[in-house]
């Protein structure tokens, strides 16, 4: 469809992208972040090397699975950099599909428009680091603005749209103390303890090929780091079992 973002990847049925849902996955090109551990970097730097899926084909393949699919996850890249994103999502909503948006939170104005327009049923927002300039730009690139990410989190905290927060852990890029600050900062924004989906960093085929391989955590190590961070957040005096303290 003319004027809409190009679809550069399509998974007909996904079981892990939207918790508790069976959803198709649509990939949009380009991104305004440059995370060193990004494994979709060719979708960002060279999207023309990927096939473009006709949106009508995507819709037809989804329609054939109606009754089995719950909806579609729109991911990237970073979907919110596309000014035509609201019109793109309307195509799915008009066909009675629920939409989950994956975002880095860098465009709160666009996120607010999507929320106000009823165009998204859920959001997964990637929190790259504590909401502070130095660690955020280290983990997401020099153009990353943690203040914009904070505004996106505040929008989600005020809305009724279910929000999942995700953080990728590479021990060379994120310390336990920084993980603890992510916990306290996001919990303060949401007014209660906000669970985070911690993800081990996959170090094969990353944007930064020099990213140390030993920074990737296995499941056991990641669980230990998360427990340490949660305990540190509690002992810091900023987080209690019932939520953040004033």
Regions found by a protein language model. Give the residues of each.
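Auxiliary Fe-S-binding modules of radical SAM enzymes
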Residues: 1-16, 20, 173-246
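Canonical Radical SAM [4Fe-4S] cluster-binding loop centered on the CxxxCxxC motif
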Residues: 18-53
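Conserved alpha-helical substructure of the radical SAM core
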Residues: 41-72
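Hydrophobic alpha-helical segments typical of transmembrane helices
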Residues: 54-58, 110, 225
